[in-house]
């Protein structure tokens, strides 16, 4: 995980998730690493980058998603432990 922050925005519905992803990558220097469909219409979008950029990106993503849908959760892990990669969806851990 290279000590990069991990940011997540969880939405109800794919449209809000796509809107969040678009806003996140446009608003800050972050890398969109994927998404996970949780079930019951919940979709989590995940980004990586330095802490400040990830915080700015998740704030922008959540605001954009609220314009078209519902935001369930927003969270930033500043320096996730390397073992956290074990629970990330396939294709997201690097």
UniProtKB/Swiss-Prot annotation:
Specify the protein name: Bacterial microcompartment shell protein PduA
Would you say which domain of life the source belongs to? Bacteria
The record gives the effect of mutating residue 40 to L as: Crystallized, central pore is more hydrophobic but same size, less permeable to PD, 50% DDH activity, cells grow slowly on 1,2-PD
Please give the annotated consequence of changing residue 40 to T: No change in shell permeability, wild-type growth on 1,2-PD
Q: What, per the annotation, is the impact of changing residue 40 to A?
A: No change in shell permeability to PD, excretes more propionaldehyde, wild-type growth on 1,2-PD
Pfam families listed in its UniProt record: BMC (PF00936)
- Subunit field text: Homohexamer with a central pore of about 5.6 Angstroms in diameter. The hexamers pack against each other in arrays. Interacts with the N-terminus of PduP which targets PduP to the BMC. Modeling suggests PduC, PduD, PduE, PduL and PduP interact with a cleft formed by the C-terminal segments of 2 adjacent PduA subunits (on the BMC luminal side) in the hexamer.
User: Where would I find the BMC domain in this sequence?
Assistant: 5-89
User: Which SMART domains does the UniProt record give?
Assistant: BMC
- Keywords assigned by UniProt, alphabetized: Bacterial microcompartment, Transport
Q: What does the record say mutating residue 40 to H does?
A: Crystallized, central pore is less symmetric, no change in shell permeability, increased permeability to glycerol, wild-type growth on 1,2-PD
Effect ascribed to mutating residue 29 to A? Subject to propionaldehyde toxicity, makes about 75% BMCs, shells are wrinkled and leaky
Its UniProt domain note says: The C-terminal 14 residues mediate binding to the N-terminus of PduP, which encapsulates PduP into BMCs.
